[in-house]
Amino acid sequence: MIKILIPTAKEMKVCQNIARPKLSAQTKIIIDYFSTLTVSDLEDIYRINTSAARCEAQRWQDFKSKQLTLNPAIKLFNGLMYRNIKRHNLSTSEAQFMENSVFITSALYGIIPAMTLISPHRLDFNTKIKINNNSLKVFWRENYDTFMQSDDIMVSLLSNEFETVFSPKERQKLIHLNFIEDRDGQLKTHSTISKKARGKCLTAMMENNCQTLEHLKQLRFDGFCYDNELSDSKQLTFVKKQT
């Protein structure tokens, strides 16, 4: 079975669903840390203005309450990749694929199924804080490595920021997907191409219930198709010809 790892996003689209949160012990440790910080502290950590820091301070205080605004993670995050993922009006098969095969790598929650209910927050692995005297990457490493202890095929749609949370040994198990545009023989890629293509690729995998690498290689999405010459056992490259 294939499991697909995707990153979080800074941009969020919040819905008002109030419920009692279920939080892991590690998540609670991070919340306890941030809930003690002042607005001034958050300005420095996030490098944001006072108004934005006040908003973040309130969010961390809200985590300490018994009820929170919760959203399915796949619908809360709303960056470019997420906006190119089919997230609404899913068929039964598509919903099952989303629940069982798509996982979000979070600096607050760990690795979670895409439909997990979570709350709005600002935190990534580049945030310069220490939790139990460790960076966030080190703090989560054992949890992330444990996720890799299965026979599933691990497909990474992650940036380097998220992949380096895994130990080097576990990182070697990841299958990376690359997305390139061919413009008159010139191969080009940049973050916008990659983010859009990741979302389109994930949608195609979900719609086709893709469970093997061979099936993945056969997919066509948004003009992209698999290029064997530019690929190897750990790097699958998809090319889109532009005229």
Swiss-Prot record:
Q: Which GO terms describe its biological process?
A: response to hydroperoxide
InterPro entries according to UniProt? YaaA
Q: Name one GO cellular component term.
A: cytosol
Instruction: Check the record and name the PANTHER family matching this protein.
Output: PEROXIDE STRESS RESISTANCE PROTEIN YAAA, PEROXIDE STRESS RESPONSE PROTEIN YAAA
NCBIfam families (UniProt xref): PRK02101.1-4
Tell me the protein family, please: Belongs to the UPF0246 family.
- Name it: UPF0246 protein gbs2036
Q: Which organism is it from?
A: Streptococcus agalactiae serotype III (strain NEM316)
